[in-house]
């Protein structure tokens, strides 16, 4: 079980209300209906499905911060003390039809973020995309916002200093916990590999762990029920009833 987030004095006491308002302003551009049975969100104006993704980057380091050794004799070093690190970017779908996606990158510049947006659009070519994203400087660059508008990607910025509202943070937490150093030591012939082979192997482990973790949709239930469903139902309550909508020309 993950430990709770510490209170950040920089975070506004109204961060939850701010997040709901941000989503409300994005959703009001469309005529969305949430299907309780399938979990899908549909825009009734265009008859397209709406997908909600949680997007963030994370750095992975494959050594522990410290190693405790208790021995009455001279201890034998069995751990690779070299540093191997890489940076991953992930799109975690909060809707059943969305295709989760993870990739690795060298930096987090605005050009890199633009390429990531193009990748997620290729993975989901026809749907409307709402992206939960933090306030990192590259995420708020004008060229990134302009590209998102061209690709029909709605950027839903989180309130500052509120990682608990970002579902993919729990995915990264579990991913790092599952790939601790003691498991890496068990990889066959790991010590005999060169640096590039080790990094490729570790990236493979991260990718497999990511797709395995995102199959469990319980991580985002709280965000979905508390923040995403209410604005949709508040904007268009009649579309969430049993009454069928008839359009008269």
Locate each region found by the language model.
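C-terminal anion-handling pockets and recognition modules
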Residues: 47-50, 168-249
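Charge-mixed, compositionally biased segments that are often intrinsically disordered regulatory tracts
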Residues: 1-84, 231, 243-249
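The start of beta-strands in P-loop NTPase/AAA+ ATPase cores
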Residues: 51, 129-130
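Short, conserved catalytic/metal-binding motifs centered on acidic residues
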Residues: 53-59, 92, 133-135, 166-169
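Acidic, metal-coordinating catalytic cores used for nucleic-acid/nucleotide bond scission
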Residues: 61, 131-144, 160-165
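A short acidic, amphipathic alpha-helical/loop segment
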Residues: 116-119, 143-147
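Electropositive, glycine- and tryptophan-enriched low-complexity nucleic-acid-binding patches
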Residues: 63-64, 73-127
